[in-house]
A protein has these predicted regions:
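Outer-membrane beta-barrel "beta-signal"
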Residues: 77-79, 85, 151, 205-218
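Extracellular/periplasm-exposed beta-strand and loop segments of Gram-negative cell-envelope proteins
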Residues: 49-75, 97-136, 163-205
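Outer-membrane beta-barrel strand-turn architecture
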Residues: 39-43, 80-84, 145-147, 218
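Transmembrane beta-strands of outer-membrane beta-barrel pores
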Residues: 28-30, 49-55, 92-98, 145, ...
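N-terminal signal peptide c-region/cleavage motif recognized by signal peptidases
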Residues: 14-16
Length: 218
């Protein structure tokens, strides 16, 4: 009898460990999906991708920008479920998340660092904001497992430890003032504008993760 019970328990554990599933999700890392595989009754591995492109106007500094947010996240995670569907999650994320900005003239002029230039003097202003750590740790909690049997709901709440942000901003002088003192002043103003952008995002050290989705397990 004991041998029969032990064999049944081992078979159940093996079945749980070999379960696989796929999930579709959306949230602050974009829209994407996961592939999950059970390793042990309380442990599973998950591999996923999510992405999104989003355009918006930005008016937070002297320059008005057209912004394009690009999210690209590949993840490799371990889910530990000590109590029912609730779990702890950790792993790494290849996080290529960035905001590209292009300055937009107002009535044919740019105002940068408090100085106004015509579009002939200042040809374009382009910048980028992205996380310092391209490959970053992930820590979080969640509900549900992608490798669970049947159709289920799952959710994640956590952070990508991006290590802060990097900013860049370039101002391209018009052909008529290339190599002049005015062009040097434009470059200095662009650096001051970059520092303003940097100051606004200095406190954002992590990327918040809030995702919900649906899984199908086999």
């Amino acid at each position: 009898m004991k041998r029969t019970l032990l064999a049944a328990a081992l078979m159940a554990a093996a079945g749980s460990a070999s379960a696989v599933g796929i999930g579709v999700r959306g949230g602050t890392t974009g829209i994407g999906g996961d592939f999950g595989i059970g390793i042990a009754p309380t442990l599973s591995a998950r591999f996923g991708f999510s992405g999104l492109n989003y355009n918006r106007n930005i008016h937070d500094t002297d320059v008005d920008y057209d912004g394009r947010l690009q999210l690209r996240n590949f993840s490799a995670l371990l889910d530990f479920s000590p109590v029912g569907p609730f779990r702890l999650t950790g792993g790494i994320v290849n996080a290529d998340n960035r905001l590209n900005v292009t300055g937009r003239p107002s009535n044919g002029t740019y105002t940068i660092n408090g100085h106004t230039y015509s579009s002939a003097e200042l040809g374009s202003v382009d910048g980028e904001i992205k996380g310092k750590n391209r490959v970053a740790p992930y820590l979080g909690i969640g509900y549900g497992n992608v490798s669970g049997m049947g159709v289920n709901f799952y959710a994640d709440l956590g952070v990508i430890l991006a290590g802060g942000n990097k900013t860049s901003l370039s101002a391209n002088c018009g052909a008529a003032i290339q190599g002049t003192a005015q062009c040097d002043q434009i470059q200095a103003d662009a650096e001051q504008e970059r520092q303003k952008l940097d100051d606004k995002i200095r406190g954002f050290k992590v990327w918040p993760v809030i995702n919900i989705g649906v899984t199908i397990g086999f």
